[in-house]
């Protein structure tokens, strides 16, 4: 009991240290935690999530190639046009555009490019930017749990498919429930005071001359290679969804399966990157310098350290976890969503949280191919791994706060009371609630 107490202290200390260091420090601190747990507290090292890391690397490589060819900018340009064309609907369009950008790209960092546009359009309509900004940032995080190419979804489909929930079925649950949750949250936020000219912070900045009027940006010309790179990438995503569905046990269009789903995603994405490099004539040596590549490789290190730390602790206490979790979650299914929510707050990654906890939960609930009565709990609760918005240190949150020159999107005085907390909790709560309605019907 005493040993377990010290192990939990080391686990929590490593997570808090990682959050404090930020960036790559999240992964570094995870490695430090593994070192202390194994060498000083006698635990056996857990499994390193190489499959998740490889998928992230492959997807990020393809997106980075598309970014280098101008395809990512073209995608953002399309999003900008939509936002500027219907400015009065910014509260619904900002989260919608952010959501579908993330669904397609598999990373929430695409929202960075939208932030200045959201601020401009909101300001021109006398709407506080904090509402559409917070909705867009949170939507980009929860969309990771519905993106066909995100590491989290790929991992979950891989572990749940042998239990009878194939790739396409899971997407049929996660995409509509998470998107509808984003729209319902936008509707609820519409009842708050959204008038920009009623915000004292904004009026003070306006009086001091710190705020310039919204500027309409001139439309850039898009090269053929930018458009081509986007279509190649979209083709790759569609091919992955089709292939993963075709090799699933329920559909079984391709049999025998020579290339498994994880390997297929890696090879498809690397092939997409190759085609972009060839046909869009980009310099492959420069891809590593792109912002997407850097943030993606940072994510790999974070997943490496944090997921390894989580698996080291969990795998050494699997019997105790099984004993308590089996009856608690079976009797109170929502507790899994709460546990995933709290874990993702600290682990800072949907994929890392899923990798660290879901295998243990499956074992604890006794789920197998022959016993799937509790499978819906895991599928419905998955969206709750999106609580990256709780601590205001995530890059997209900080970017939204920094780029909102109106001053309406603020850091909380008491850390947690920031602009993203309420919409974030609402989106996750509604996603999970809708999941508990839809999952039993679809599975």
Swiss-Prot record:
GO MF, one example: C4-dicarboxylate transmembrane transporter activity
TM spans (from-to): 21-41, 46-66, 99-119, 142-162, 171-191, 228-248, 264-284, 295-315, 327-347, 375-395, 419-439
A single GO cellular-component term on record: plasma membrane
Membrane topology annotation: Multi-pass membrane protein
Keyword 4Fe-4S set for record: no
Function per UniProt: Responsible for the transport of C4-dicarboxylates.
Xref: PANTHER family: ANAEROBIC C4-DICARBOXYLATE TRANSPORTER DCUB (PTHR36106), C4-DICARBOXYLATE TRANSPORTER DCUA (PTHR36106:SF2)
Protein name: C4-dicarboxylate transporter DcuA
Source organism per UniProt: Helicobacter pylori (strain J99 / ATCC 700824)
Gene: dcuA
């Amino acid at each position: 009991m005493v040993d377990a107490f010290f192990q939990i202290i080391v686990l929590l200390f490593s997570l808090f240290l990682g959050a404090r260091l930020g960036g790559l420090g999240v992964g570094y601190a995870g490695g430090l935690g593994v070192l202390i747990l194994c060498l000083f507290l006698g635990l056996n090292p857990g499994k390193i999530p190489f499959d998740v890391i490889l998928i992230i690397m492959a997807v990020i490589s393809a997106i980075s190639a598309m970014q280098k060819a101008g395809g990512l900018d073209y995608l953002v340009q399309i999003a900008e046009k939509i936002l500027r064309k219907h400015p009065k609907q910014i509260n619904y369009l900002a989260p919608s555009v952010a959501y579908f950008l993330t669904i397609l790209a598999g990373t929430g960092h695409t929202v960075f490019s939208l932030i200045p546009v959201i601020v401009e359009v909101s300001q021109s309509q006398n709407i506080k930017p904090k509402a559409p900004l917070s909705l867009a940032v949170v939507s980009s995080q929860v969309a990771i749990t519905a993106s066909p190419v995100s590491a989290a979804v790929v991992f979950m489909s891989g572990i749940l498919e042998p239990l009878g929930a194939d790739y396409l079925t899971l997407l049929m649950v996660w995409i509509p429930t998470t998107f509808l949750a984003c729209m319902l949250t936008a509707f609820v936020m519409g009842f708050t005071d959204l008038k920009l000219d009623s915000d004292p912070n904004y009026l003070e900045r306006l009086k001091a001359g710190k705020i310039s009027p919204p500027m309409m940006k001139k439309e850039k010309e898009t090269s053929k290679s930018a458009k081509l790179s986007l279509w190649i990438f979209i083709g790759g995503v569609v091919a992955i969804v089709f292939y993963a569905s075709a090799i699933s046990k329920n559909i079984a269009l391709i049999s025998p399966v020579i290339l498994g789903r994880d390997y297929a995603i890696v090879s498809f994405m690397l092939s997409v990157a190759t085609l972009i490099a060839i046909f869009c004539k980009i310099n492959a040596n420069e891809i590593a310098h792109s912002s997407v590549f850097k943030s993606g490789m940072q994510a790999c290190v974070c997943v490496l350290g944090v997921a390894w730390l989580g698996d080291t602790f969990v795998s050494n206490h699997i019997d105790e976890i099984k004993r308590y979790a089996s009856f608690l979650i079976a009797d109170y299914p929502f507790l899994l969503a709460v546990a995933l929510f709290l874990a993702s707050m600290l682990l800072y990654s949907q994929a890392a949280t899923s990798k660290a906890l879901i295998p243990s939960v499956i074992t604890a609930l006794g789920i197998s191919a022959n016993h799937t009565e509790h499978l819906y709990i895991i599928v419905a609760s998955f969206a709750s791994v999106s609580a990256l918005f709780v601590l205001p240190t995530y890059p997209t949150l900080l970017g939204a706060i920094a780029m909102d020159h109106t001053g309406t999107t603020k850091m909380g005085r008491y850390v947690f009371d920031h602009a993203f907390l309420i919409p974030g909790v609402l989106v996750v709560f509604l996603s999970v609630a809708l999941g508990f309605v839809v999952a039993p019907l679809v599975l």
